[in-house]
A protein has these predicted regions:
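Flexible, solvent-exposed loop/hinge segments and secondary-structure transition points
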Residues: 2-208
Length: 208
């Protein structure tokens, strides 16, 4: 009986401690949630501004977003509409290069309706440190080579790494990584340009 009482008390004590810890954790979460959400929003806004300059839009870019149907905009996972004076001026979209050296490379691309690439940034990757990670702006300015490049029928041959006959540099000892990014930017940009009518229709709800 004595052992039972001790065990019961010990169990109640553990339960009380667990309940207290849960309550404290919940309280901390509620106190910090808004700040965390605000920080994430600011980070996303800053990233978008790296691929679409502020003077391209006067709408709320963060809230002008769609998740496209893949049968219509294949490879475009998330799409932001830049609107200025009720006219679509640019798009920012998330896409994934599936053939990086170490797997998927997630990208954010900014492009105008005329095919000018305003910027490209890497959102996530698992490439080899010291080789493939030169796709990160904090390590190398290679990713800036896409800025202001134009995708039109006459320039398609240029959209490859130099080893494949194009104009984009590859990395010494790491051709696969830059090749994957160049090819995916090209593929996804062509999908966007080939669906101009659909994009204009989608943009109407944000041009009011």
């Amino acid at each position: 009986m004595g052992i039972f009482k001790v065990t019961s008390r010990f169990g109640l004590l553990l339960g009380f401690i667990a309940l207290t810890c849960t309550a404290v954790s919940a309280g901390i979460y509620m106190l910090t949630k808004d700040k965390i959400d605000e920080a994430m929003t600011e980070q996303q806004k800053a990233l978008l501004l790296q691929v679409i300059p502020q003077d391209y839009f006067n709408n709320n870019l963060l809230e002008s977003v769609e998740t496209p149907e893949q049968d219509k905009l294949k490879g475009i996972q998330k799409l932001y509409f830049a609107i200025k004076n009720n006219v679509p001026t640019a798009y920012a979209y998330e896409t994934t290069a599936p053939d990086g050296y170490s797997g998927n490379i997630r990208l954010l691309v900014g492009i105008t309706p005329k095919g000018e690439v305003l910027g490209v940034r890497v959102i996530e990757h698992h490439e080899t440190p010291g080789l493939g990670d030169k796709i990160e702006l904090r390590i190398s300015d290679w990713i800036l080579s896409f800025t202001n490049q134009v995708i039109v029928p006459e320039s398609l041959k240029d959209w490859a790494v130099k080893k494949d006959g194009g104009k984009f540099d590859q990395f010494s000892g790491a051709t696969i990584t830059p090749r994957a990014i160049v090819n995916q930017v090209k593929r996804s940009a062509l999908v966007m340009l080939e669906n101009e009518a659909l994009l204009n229709e989608m943009a109407k709800k944000y041009a009011q």
